[in-house]
């Protein structure tokens, strides 16, 4: 696709359904690290930005009945995801509030973002897209240029 179509961005979704048939290890941690290294080498060689969608293992509900917020360590092969990734984003739904949070879990290069920064979105069925979720508090705050 890089040579035929000239793609510059690739989304692998979901990661666990795309197998590495040349894998040399049955150990999930070693497999994950080797696979991520192959993806990184591909990205550098062809100058392609790759988003890897990796779902967490089973998440449990907290005492208040909400599903706990996962981290990169909740993905199968946990520590390798954090160690091998330059950046990590969390997309987490709050089904009660009907919002979706996007949170920065890891930023290797600090000029590209801030660890822990988050934004909230609401699904807009008419447009078929997510729109920024604005609370009354946020609406009252002036923008930096105001």
Please place each PLM-identified region on the residue numbering.
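Non-membrane alpha-helical structural segments and their capping/turn regions in soluble enzymes
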Residues: 26-33
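Walker B catalytic acidic pair
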Residues: 14
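P-loop NTPase catalytic core of nucleic-acid-dependent motor ATPases
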Residues: 51
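Conserved ATPase-coupling elements of RecA-like P-loop NTPase cores
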Residues: 19-26
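C-terminal regions of RecA-like/P-loop NTPase motor modules
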Residues: 1-10, 24, 37-47, 58-146
